[in-house]
Design a protein with these regions (language model features):
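Glycoside hydrolase catalytic-domain context in secreted enzymes
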Residues: 1-8, 18-26, 30-32, 54-427
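Short consensus segments that form the blades of beta-propeller domains
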Residues: 12-14
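Short beta-strand elements
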Residues: 32-58
Length: 427
């Protein structure tokens, strides 16, 4: 049986392992096989990772349900993000990219209408959670407990709304102490090649020097996952020495071309290689108690204009076969408990407030439990913490400005969403 890593994602909305013979070889380069080191893997029939009632459009297939690494079967989540684009495929190799053109009035109107997001967050059947209970528990008491252990509810009952504001809306380079649950101040650092710097507001004047490591692209060029693991171990040991709990890294986006503005922070153009490296680094760091915010989730493959509402267009197949893979492997194989969302829109939806991305794929499909922080909030109007929490996010990187919970905090539904975000973050 071939690994499901050989699967493809079809236009009909499911993963498929196609029937046939797969030759796997060890090579010195793309063209030269090393000492005839090859093996052949045979798949007798098409295997569709879906329920039989789905109807994949694939002939002569066997339905095998969800992938073993998933919690639910994968289905299309981003049809609206494909856009009006001519995509290359096996039958249309001759497509030539057109010259740039100005949007028509009709296109601009359709685009602006698509940016409008339903802000409904009221369910009449919801009951407001308890606040400020005196149950005598501390966050330390939760150590080792499952996410759904009943003790968590008792701990969360001790939080006040002010505590939630502090946890979810005022994060960045660490999180504040919350006395009602015995949570201490924590500190977090950037970036993928080092615990690079801190801010006076949290740590005082920075008088020490940290280790700078080779860039991720050089690490990936070694193809050495053991070395990637050693990197995660080393940087987390350094974090222990400086009382650093969280790390805004690794960078897990993709080299779409040689001129991307942050290629030095990302591994490679290949999702499998990038994912193998990020999973090894994250796994080693998390074993030492450092949580790693894999970033920037997702499709942050362009630096220019990314934090001014850049809209990114891609089809579901490209997302799942290339751009999501490094994050997926970091979650499933590396055990990541933290993610940083990206500035850009996926289609017309800000990635940090995309239910499809943060809830349907990351949490429900991949089984992720943990915190999803935004990228650095530099007073960008689109970075709405309420929309982020509704979509499955947890907190805002730098809670300055007008980003508040004025709406969510006024309804039982909103308060429950805030409580769930606090639960994910504290876990």
């Amino acid at each position: 049986m071939c690994s499901s890593d050989l699967k493809c994602y079809t236009s009909t909305g499911s993963y498929v392992l196609e029937a046939g013979e797969y030759q796997i070889s060890l090579r010195t380069d793309s063209h030269t096989v090393k000492d005839n080191l090859t093996m052949t893997c045979k798949v007798a029939e098409n295997e569709v990772f879906q329920d039989s009632a789905f109807g994949s459009g694939v002939e002569n297939c066997k339905y095998v349900g969800k992938r073993s690494s998933d919690e639910v079967v994968a289905t299309n989540q981003f049809d609206d993000a494909a856009g009006d684009v001519a995509y290359l495929n096996r039958d249309t190799w001759q497509i030539v990219p057109g010259t740039s053109k100005e949007a028509t009035a009709e296109q601009l109107e359709a685009f602006n209408n698509a940016l409008v997001v339903d802000d409904s967050y009221v369910d009449a059947d919801d009951t407001a959670p308890t606040f400020g209970a005196k149950n005598g528990l501390t966050l330390k008491d939760m150590e080792g407990l499952a996410y759904d252990d009943a003790q968590w509810d008792k701990l969360l009952d001790q939080l006040t709304l002010d505590d939630m504001y502090k946890l979810l809306g005022a994060d960045g380079w660490g999180s504040a102490a919350v006395d009602n649950i015995g949570k201490g101040q924590t500190y977090e650092m950037d970036g993928p090649a080092a615990l690079s710097y801190v801010f006076d507001a949290f740590m005082g004047t920075c008088t020490y020097k940290t280790v700078t490591y080779p860039a991720e692209v050089l690490l990936a060029a070694t193809w050495n996952v053991d070395l990637a693991s050693e990197f995660g171990d080393a940087i987390s040991q350094e974090g222990k020495a400086w009382n650093i709990s969280g790390w805004y890294a690794p960078g897990a986006n993709t080299h779409r071309n040689a001129f991307a503005g942050r290629n030095f922070e990302y591994y490679s153009e290949d999702g499998f290689l990038s994912g193998s490296m990020s999973a090894a680094t994250v796994g080693a760091a998390e074993k030492n108690g450092m949580y790693c915010y894999i970033k920037h989730f997702a499709l942050n493959e362009r630096e220019t204009w990314r934090h001014y509402g850049l809209c990114t267009w891609a089809d579901e197949q490209a997302m799942r076969e290339i751009y999501f893979v490094p994050f997926e492997k970091a979650v499933k194989e590396g055990g990541s408990t933290a993610v940083m969302s990206s500035y850009n829109n996926i289609g017309t939806t800000w990635a940090g407030a995309s239910t499809a991305l943060l809830t349907n794929v990351l949490r429900n499909e991949w089984g992720f439990i943990g915190t999803v922080i935004t990228d650095n909030n530099e007073e960008h109007g689109f970075m709405d913490i309420e929309k982020a929490v509704l979509a499955g996010g947890t907190n805002l990187l730098f809670g300055w400005g007008t980003k508040t919970f004025d709406n969510l905090s006024q309804t039982a539904t909103g308060q429950l969403k805030m409580r769930e975000a606090a639960h994910q973050y504290l876990y």
